[in-house]
Regions:
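Bacterial Sec-dependent N-terminal signal peptides
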Residues: 1-26
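Subtilisin-like serine protease catalytic core
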Residues: 19-22, 92-207, 216-218, 243-248, ...
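Substrate-binding/access-modulating region of protease and related hydrolase catalytic domains
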Residues: 21-23, 168-172, 185-280, 291, ...
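N-terminal domain-start motif of subtilase-like serine proteases
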Residues: 25-123, 146-154, 238-242, 265-267, ...
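Catalytic-core environment of secreted peptidases
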Residues: 124, 129-139, 287-352
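C-terminal subdomain of the subtilisin-like protease fold in secreted/lumenal serine endopeptidases
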Residues: 185, 363-442
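Hydrolase catalytic cores
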Residues: 324-392
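Short amphipathic, basic-aromatic surface patches that mediate peripheral association
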Residues: 446-451
């Protein structure tokens, strides 16, 4: 079995880009096409089985609607477990500042001028797609939003998430993390098959998934065993991403932080469901505010967490969520007109803050190394360079901390001066790899090893 490891040794102290056919072929060479096809087929069978269970339940309960709308929140019956409907629920300048992404964007202090040009990210959303006609997506004369499946319904949620990712900055306060990237807009009616197609056809590096199963849905509390469990949804995502090691799926942690239920691991914790507990996904929590110094350092050693952000850990003790982004009162694109904007709060907003920032880090890594990071490398880079949110070290609230795009970019650039090391290696059972490093003593020596 081949495992890939990253060693990122982090010492604290204008590029151009085009994704070429050669680069796309290099990404595709890492894919296990047979396994991708098999996982997609299995998930299609799971989708058919879920649809049968939901259809039968709705026939027996005609007063219950499959999709319900409450303000900007959408809840859709996803499955029936133990006779109970399981709901799937919808979970930019301030966001960029919080994760220090403004340092690596155009005009940032690092003079990197990263914009995500000629790069792509796709999103899956409950209930509808992105308003592609919005001015923020039409700055080039044609929309940078591409619809990947059928259906014409647009939603505020999808449009807001898309803006956080790729809004051009016509309104500077609503500028997205990667304002020149293109975006594929899908609904969650089907995920694995179109995602696999995107990965194979477009060498897709990143996807954003701001949805999930809440602890308390329209029909009450989800079965207690679901919270923190490594269930079939989590396993399916791990299988898919193992076959596509270049692709990182970013998930919102959920907004069940204030919900109470009996039988959890600890009061206030154990509120992550399904794919949020997958090993290979990146699960994002929601910070409400942070005080930063001029160099992007966290002042007073505290990142304020939004109380609604769902906490881990997983039932088997792994650190989840993985990372924290800014998702409180985020100003982004809206619906109703092509110049509509508005604020929104939730891990649905912090996830695209993180996903779009990682897209820029992939752009930078390719500029400096002529290749893109594997998903595990990108994940370790983000987690290994994050700013502690409260207590030192990882925890079930912040994960590894608040994303620090500036520190991550410095780590990529630091390889040239040997102040950092990013290494992707294959390691067989029983083998060992040895890296000799020298710590200067005045700053922390940090390592992150994923597989």
């Amino acid at each position: 079995m081949k495992n890939y490891y990253l060693i990122a040794l982090i010492i604290s102290f204008s590029f151009s880009f085009a994704q070429t056919e050669t680069e796309i072929r290099a990404i595709k060479s890492n894919l296990d096409l047979d396994v991708l096809e098999q996982v997609s087929f299995e998930e299609i069978q799971n989708e058919i089985a879920r649809e049968k269970r939901v259809t039968k339940f709705l026939m027996l309960n005609p007063s219950i609607e499959r999709i319900e709308y409450s303000g900007n929140t959408i809840q859709r019956i996803y499955d029936i477990i133990e006779g109970t409907p399981i709901y799937q629920s919808t979970d930019n300048a301030e966001a960029a500042i919080g994760t220090r992404t403004n340092f690596i964007q155009v005009g940032g202090d690092m003079n990197l001028n990263l914009e995500g040009e000629n790069m792509r990210i796709s999103i899956w959303e409950v209930g509808g797609k992105t308003q592609s006609t919005h001015v923020e997506f039409n700055d080039t004369g044609e929309s940078r939003i591409e619809f990947g499946d059928s259906g014409n319904d647009v939603t505020f949620h999808s449009t807001h998430v898309s803006g956080t990712l790729v809004a051009a900055g016509i309104n500077e306060d609503a500028k997205g993390m990667a304002p020149k990237a293109t975006l594929g807009s899908y609904t969650t009616n089907s995920v694995f098959s179109p995602l696999s197609t995107e990965i194979i056809s477009n060498a897709l590096l990143l996807s954003n998934h701001s949805y999930g199963v809440p602890v308390i849905g329209n029909n009450g509390t989800a079965p207690t065993w679901l919270m923190g469990a490594y269930n079939n949804d989590a396993r399916s995502w791990d299988n898919l991403l193992h076959a596509a090691p270049t692709h990182l799926a970013v998930f919102s942690a959920g907004n069940s932080g204030n919900d109470q239920y009996s039988g959890g691991l600890a009061d206030g914790f154990d509120k992550l469901v399904g794919e949020k507990n997958s090993k290979n996904t990146l699960t994002v929590a929601n910070a409400s505010s942070v005080n930063l110094g001029s160099e992007g350092q966290v002042l007073f050693g505290l990142v304020n967490m939004n109380s609604s952000s769902s906490r881990g850990p997983t039932d088997d003790g792994r650190v989840k969520p993985d990372i924290t982004g800014m998702g409180t009162n985020i100003f982004s694109t809206g619906v109703g007109s092509d110049t509509a904007y508005g604020p929104a709060t939730g891990t649905s907003m912090s996830a695209p803050n993180v996903a779009g920032s990682i897209l820029l880090l992939q752009e930078l890594y390719n500029d400096t190394n002529n290749q893109y990071m594997l998903a595990a490398t990108a994940k370790a880079l983000v987690c290994g360079t994050a700013s502690d949110g409260g207590v030192n070290g990882p925890d079930a609230t912040y994960g590894w901390g608040l994303m620090n795009s500036k520190k991550a970019a410095e780590t990529i650039l630091g390889e040239a001066s040997e102040s950092s090391l990013i290494s992707e290696q294959s390691l067989l059972n029983g083998e060992s790899l040895v890296f000799d490093v020298t710590a200067c003593g005045s700053v922390d020596l940090v390592s992150a090893i994923p597989w």
